[in-house]
Amino acid sequence: MEKLKINLINSLDFYDKCLLGNGNENSFRYELMQPMKTMWDYLNVPLKATQSNGYDIVMASEMLGIWTPRKSIQQVKDNFPELIESGIFEEYQEVISKGIDEFEKRGYSIPLEEIYVNILLGDEDSQEMKVNKGYSGFGGIPGYIMLMIVPNDFNKKRLKSALAHEFNHNVRFTFEPFNHGDVTVEEYIVLEGLAECFAEEMYGKELIGPWIADFDKEEMEYSIEVIKEGRMAKGFGEVSAYMFGDDVAKKRGYSPVGLSANAGYTIGYHLIKQYLVNSNKSIAEATLTPTEEIIRVSKFFD
C-alpha cells in the first residue's frame, strides 16, 4: 500500500495576504478552507451561505475559535510571527509520520490515502481559545486535522503534542466511527483519553494539554461517580456537560451535571492509563480496541 500522503494547507500565504490588506472572507473560504471541503460537508457547513449573514464556513470557523477576516487584523500582526516561530510549520510532517509508524509497527495500515493539515490562527476574543490556554484542535473527520492557535509561551511548546492528539482521533475514527448525535459519555471519555495518552507517549507527560485537570483524591472519586452514573447518556449536548464541566455547559446552554472544568477529559485520561496497565497493550493497540472492551478491562467503574 502506498505511503499515506500528508498535505499542509498553505495558511502562511493566506496570512501574508491578510497583512498586505488583500485577505477577505472569500479568500478565507476558497483558499484556506476549500481544500477541507469534504470535512465541512460531513459537518453540514456550506462554503458560502445562501443568504446574507447565514450559517457558513466563516461563521462555523468563528464558533470553533478560528480567526477570520471579520476580526481585527491587529491579531494577525501580533500573533502570526509567533506562530511561525513556534516551529510547527517545520515539524507537522514529522509528528504525523511518527504517528503513522506507531500504527504500522502494529500491522495497522491506516485506511486513508491522505491527511490534510491546516494550522490556523485562533481568535484572541474567542471563549474556545480562552478556556484552553490559547490552543485547540479538530480531528473528528478522518483525513483532516485543524490546529487553532493564539501563540503563547504555554502552548508553543505543546503544539506537536496537540497535533498528535488530533491525529489519534483521525485513526480512532477509521476504526470506530463517531456519530455526534448518538455518542455516549462512555465513548467520548475513551476517545479523549486515548488521544491524550497517545500524545503523552509521543511527547512526554510535561507537554499534555490543559484539558487534563489535576484533581485531588476527593474530586477524582466524586467525578468518577458522576460520570459512572451518566456514562450511557447520549447526544453531543448532554455529553458535553460531562466532558467540559458545568461552567462551559451553562455558557453553551446545556444542563450542568455537577462537574468541574474538563472532568470528562481528565477521567478519560486516567481510565485509559488504567486500561493500559491492566491489558498490557500499547497506546496504539488500545486505539484499535472497542470502547466496550476498554471499559470492561480497565475495571475503572467497577
Regions inferred by a protein language model and the residue ranges of each:
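Short pre-active-site segment immediately N-terminal to the catalytic Zn-binding motif
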Residues: 147-162
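Auxiliary, metal-adjacent structural segments of Zn-dependent hydrolase domains
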Residues: 79-141
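Hydrophobic/aromatic-lined pockets within catalytic cores
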Residues: 104, 168-176, 199-207, 272, ...
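Active-site recognition of the HExxH zinc-binding catalytic motif
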Residues: 161-174, 192, 196
